[in-house]
C-alpha cells in the first residue's frame, strides 16, 4: 500500500460493533458468531500494521453496522491502537480530503477553503474522546449547532 500511495480506511468501529454483538447469545447464528468474534481483532491488527508501515490512513464513516452518529468513537479506537491524537484528527480532515482529491477546498483551516469546523470543550490532543462531545458545528460557513454555557 505504501509503495503505491494507497490509503487505508480501517473503520475499526465496524469491527468493534460486530465483535461485541457476537458475544450476545442469539444475535448471530452460531456459524457466523465464531467468525464475527474475530473481525474486531483482525481490523485492529491490520490497522497497527498500516500505522507501523507508515501507510496513509484516512477516516472511515460508512461502517453500515454501528449506530449512526457515533462516528467519533473511531478516533478513540485509532488512538487506542497507537495512533497519535493529532494524526487521528488529520485522518478525518486533510488525509480524507486528499484521498477524495478535494484538499484545495476542504481538510484544513485556511483562507479560501470551505469552513467546516467543530469545537469541543478541552483539548482533544489530551483526550481524543472529547470529539464525541461537540458543542459547535459549522459546515460550509453555516452554523448547525452552537451550545454555549
Regions found by a protein language model. Give the residues of each.
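Active-site gating loops and adjacent loop-to-helix segments of metal-dependent hydrolytic enzymes
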Residues: 4-40
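His/Asp/Glu-enriched, well-ordered alpha-helical/loop segment
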Residues: 28-31, 38-123
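Small/polar (Gly/Ser/Thr/Ala-rich) solvent-exposed segments
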Residues: 126
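Short, small/polar residue-rich loop motifs at catalytic or cofactor-binding pockets
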Residues: 130-132
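Short aromatic-centered micro-motifs
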Residues: 137
Amino acid at each position: 500500500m505504501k509503495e503505491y500511495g494507497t490509503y487505508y480506511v480501517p473503520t475499526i468501529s465496524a469491527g468493534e460493533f460486530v465483535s461485541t454483538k457476537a458475544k450476545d447469545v442469539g444475535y448471530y447464528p452460531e456459524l457466523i458468531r465464531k467468525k464475527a468474534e474475530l473481525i474486531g481483532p483482525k481490523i485492529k491488527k491490520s490497522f497497527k500494521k498500516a500505522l507501523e508501515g507508515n501507510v496513509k490512513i484516512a477516516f472511515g464513516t460508512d461502517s453500515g453496522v454501528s449506530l449512526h452518529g457515533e462516528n467519533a468513537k473511531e478516533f478513540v479506537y485509532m488512538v487506542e491502537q497507537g495512533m497519535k491524537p493529532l494524526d487521528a484528527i488529520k485522518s478525518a480532515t486533510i488525509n480524507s480530503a486528499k484521498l477524495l482529491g478535494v484538499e484545495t477546498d476542504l481538510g484544513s483551516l485556511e483562507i479560501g477553503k470551505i469552513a467546516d469546523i467543530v469545537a469541543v470543550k478541552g483539548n482533544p490532543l489530551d483526550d481524543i474522546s472529547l470529539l464525541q462531545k461537540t458543542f459547535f458545528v459549522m459546515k460550509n460557513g453555516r452554523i448547525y449547532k452552537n451550545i454555549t454555557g
